[in-house]
């Protein structure tokens, strides 16, 4: 929402006088000098603390991690945006036809105390150029643009930073972006327009940026590309201020339309519009100074019949724009501080977590290096123990190793049940054939024990290969879990990690072979048909009772009460014995095979791996080799430490800020 004239008068930060006097133009008159002094005192009292806070964060380098409040100036090519920056900063910037701003120019203005000398610095890539006079700025920026974007009309997204320190500038950060163009000319890339739009969007989409959209007064504002781009990233106009330039070029009779735009009656922006008249090309050719341009602008608006009202509303001239921008920037800083504080807190936490992954710096002393390796191996072994005991810490939506193994063992139990059920039909036919063709002198109802044994043995034998498959699956799950522990503890030490993985693989093969032998031995023992008498009797009794209950449920009476059928009775008897034994075999095999696997693939695997890791400590000569880091690890650790330090310092400064 744009403040009315009355509202403006009620704001503490209002009535700041005109922009600072440009350097090198101090002899313009006592009135201007008084205005500058008045601005300085009010600025120091009410504005400086906010700017100082952001400047201090920027000086810390926080801008490497998070966006800080700033002002970006965008506009169509030759819309007058550089002139606006020039008028605000008092520094003459590059001018000309075509694309003048070919790299983002970050203009950092720092106010010095009265009497201190003007200082400037242009920085790009790793080059710093110290400036001692404002007249050197234009050439230094052009040199930087040629260095970064090449001689010609190409653009680059690399920053050029211009630091200006002077008693006659406010503390502001302004960003001049390349002018929007639609058609490539000369040796420009064919997609120059798309490149520029992408570059501009990268800046204006940041919530921390106030967008100054510069539009000539003599064009239809609804069709301007700059305003359209700003509305895409800031649809409510919360961060956008429209600035109309070149009011002296408006066609006679269209002045009222310009007034309507400035009064926010055409394309609505919450922050509204302002209008300024900066130096034109003719003014520059006539060597009109920046201070004289401000006086000429004041006269223009005072004497213009339509635009005079805008001056009275505080919506015209560069001094009013400077006052407005100061208020907007301070308001924006205060609005951004809570979010900035949260972002710094979150970034500090994530950086701390990332730094923990890289661990501490490797000691230089050999004895300390050995102790460091002992700590790393002990941490690894503790993590392995936690896995074996089912106490490892897992992230959300992940599960512990034992949970994964339990699922496999449950599937194994289901496989046994499925296998026994699948063989029932074939068993019935086999038992029937024996009963009808091969029964010897046994009386009806007596089970041929040899047939009983053969049937049981065959069924159990079919489970051997599924047991091997489960063994291989579980081994792979355990191997993956142990490898993850190695990556967690040793990922930055490629020799130690590689040695651990090699040791892990050797032990895995050894333990898998041992487990396979034990499982096959178990199935060989299962070929001996045996069960404790009392256990078997109970199982047989249970089967008979269940069958009797089922029969009674189906027919209303048990089969024993029906007319006996010797053949059916004999078949039932055999199946009762088979089912009784299979139940006990199921209980035994479903538990014993997982026990074998846990013993060899989890318990012994872990113990041998832990012992193998401790054996690495016996060779003290290999300590340095094992602790050799990846080439970028120490650099990354240093980078994270620096980031952590500046974020911690930023947190302290934000905590002390009185606002």
Curated annotation (Swiss-Prot):
Annotated segments matching region G5 motif: 277-280
Q: Where is this region: G3 motif?
A: 176-179
Domain Dynamin-type G: start-end pairs: 65-338
* Compositional bias ranges of the Polar residues kind: 559-568
Q: Does the record's keyword annotation contain GTP-binding?
A: yes
Q: Region G2 motif: list its residue ranges.
A: 100-102
Stretch list, region Disordered: 547-568
Domain annotation GED: ranges? 571-659
- Subcellular location as annotated: Cytoplasm
| Origin: domain of life | Eukaryota
A GO MF label: GTPase activity
- What role does this protein play? Does not show activity against influenza virus or VSV; although it only differs from Mx2 by 8 positions.
Q: What is this protein called?
A: Interferon-induced GTP-binding protein Mx3
Species: Rattus norvegicus
